[in-house]
Amino acid sequence: MAKPLTERFYQPKELKVMGRWSVEDVVVNDPSLRPYINLEPRILPHSHGRHAKKPFGKAQVHIVERLINKVMRSGASSHKVGGHFMRREHRSLMGKKMKAYEVVKEAFMIIERRTKQNPIQVFIRAIENSAPREDTTTIAFGGIRYHMAVDVSPLRRLDIALKNIALGASAKCYRNKTSYAQALAEEIIAAANKDPKSFAYSKKEEIERIAQSSR
């Protein structure tokens, strides 16, 4: 008679992200972002792109995996970030998810060493502080274009925050000796502390300031 699955396979008592950090005590304070931040216990944050063709499928992707996916970007190509065009920078990470995974893991280890806190909780706080609540859109009336303030959906707020955190890290290590993991850790810590040195946090403040003037 075959043994039950619980006896045939090893089952850890607690699944930790990357085998190191628990998500049981991680708290999302922003009620609008809470349904879209996936914190399911998972050792390897990798969904194999199953969400790609599903509407709002990325809301089911683990938040750490979403950061890894943003790290694989090549940087801004149509506008300057930190005074530079960063097209094709960090191209060694493009399409190489395992390498991006190791970069994010190293960044989280740096955050844990510096803050003495769970790096996933620090990362969540950075997202909450970097997600703009208001933005502007262009409307045409009588052949004239106007900027109008609009509310930002929770999923887009999350997208903007993750994008700017990754771009801020790219800007910090652009053409200098700072590693990408170290730059990513510094960006996340600064955003979590609402430090104006954070690209993501300062960008959020700029977006909301422009939206406020367009009311």
Curated annotation (Swiss-Prot):
Entry keyword 4Fe-4S: no
Molecular function, one GO term: rRNA binding
Any one of the GO CC terms: small ribosomal subunit
Superkingdom of the source species: Archaea
Pfam families named among the record's database cross-references: Ribosomal_S7
InterPro entries per the UniProt record, alphabetical: Ribosomal_uS7, Ribosomal_uS7_arc, Ribosomal_uS7_dom, Ribosomal_uS7_dom_sf, Ribosomal_uS7_euk/arc
Assigned keywords, A-Z: Ribonucleoprotein, Ribosomal protein, RNA-binding, rRNA-binding
Keyword Ribonucleoprotein listed: yes
Function: One of the primary rRNA binding proteins, it binds directly to 16S rRNA where it nucleates assembly of the head domain of the 30S subunit. Is located at the subunit interface close to the decoding center.
Homology family: Belongs to the universal ribosomal protein uS7 family.
Name assigned to this protein: Small ribosomal subunit protein uS7
Source species: Thermococcus onnurineus (strain NA1)
Taxonomic lineage of the native organism: Archaea, Methanobacteriati, Methanobacteriota, Thermococci, Thermococcales
Encoding gene per record: rps7
